[in-house]
Swiss-Prot record:
Belongs to the acetokinase family. The lineage of its organism: Bacteria, Bacillati, Bacillota, Bacilli, Lactobacillales. GO terms for cellular component: cytoplasm. It holds the Pfam family Acetate_kinase. It is found in: Cytoplasm. It comes from Streptococcus pyogenes serotype M6 (strain ATCC BAA-946 / MGAS10394). Its cofactor is Mg(2+); Mn(2+). This is Acetate kinase.
Amino acid sequence: MSKTIAINAGSSSLKWQLYQMPEEEVLAQGIIERIGLKDSISTVKYDGKKEEQILDIHDHTEAVKILLNDLIHFGIIAAYDEITGVGHRVVAGGELFKESVVVNDKVLEHIEELSVLAPLHNPGAAAGIRAFRDILPDITSVCVFDTSFHTSMAKHTYLYPIPQKYYTDYKVRKYGAHGTSHKYVAQEAAKMLGRPLEELKLITAHIGNGVSITANYHGKSVDTSMGFTPLAGPMMGTRSGDIDPAIIPYLIEQDPELKDAADVVNMLNKKSGLSGVSGISSDMRDIEAGLQEDNPDAVLAYNIFIDRIKKCIGQYFAVLNGADALVFTAGMGENAPLMRQDVIGGLTWFGMDIDPEKNVFGYRGDISTPESKVKVLVISTDEELCIARDVERLKNTK
């Protein structure tokens, strides 16, 4: 038996989950937020308890020290050497990393170089990896890449219709993201349907603050909505999703607050989507509250959101030439029944129909009617478990 930590590090946060392996038992979980500020928050959940501390955490190394000390302080582990592996979620692995890998200096260097593809995510992941290697240098560290699952896409799918030199010289192509989530829920969907994954055609919709939709053919990703970066695809919480690229130079010319392309991309990443259109929030719960109040901006944001998701799902029905099931997962996918109802309401032509009583908050499983030709499933994603499994698989190959 061994203990493995799954880590999801952001620029100012560190989310973690401790597993007993190979039993896959969750021993504890938590998050450290606002790293770099004087009022950082560390939350630990274990044995039905919740401990929260306000601390001054300067960087990721200090955050890791606090996490490990808390594990001992709360009696979750007796000593550091009980931890035999740590797995790190990394958003962008480019073309280099087609599967999870054991970390070494070269791997870490490549992750930092690939920050250009995920500037909101890779730097934080690299900081988390460095922190664990500094404090626990003798345990196996594994990187699990969001992009790895999508390396099965065909060249005609991942290339953009621009001169090929931009791919050959600069590796401009579709990479996708959320691959660990899409892989996990596809496997769970096959179990739920009682059929081999290798026989299924699935559309998996990861709808959280970030949104990505994937066409899964016989267990492999054949297309996905996120692209060169996680900015592409349907409308998201704070991200615009797909827009006409000619808008970028136009806005630089017209708006004095947007001085260059970086300013526009920052606006598209952090100030757009549900938040930008509604002027209220990136949280669907707040948008739905606005719908109840007949707030016109909330209504508009919601309608754009539903429209873009329906179009993307419809597109992947064409890619797969039909589908056996549509899977909803992640924060909104799992917990926004109104959104699911309105998305499916625009896709009934494909043979989908949901049971209104099953499509309720908190329900997990098959929410379609017996007559529905395409099954509609709600499955809780578990990226952390996927990470822990890969650590267990790779820790003896160091």
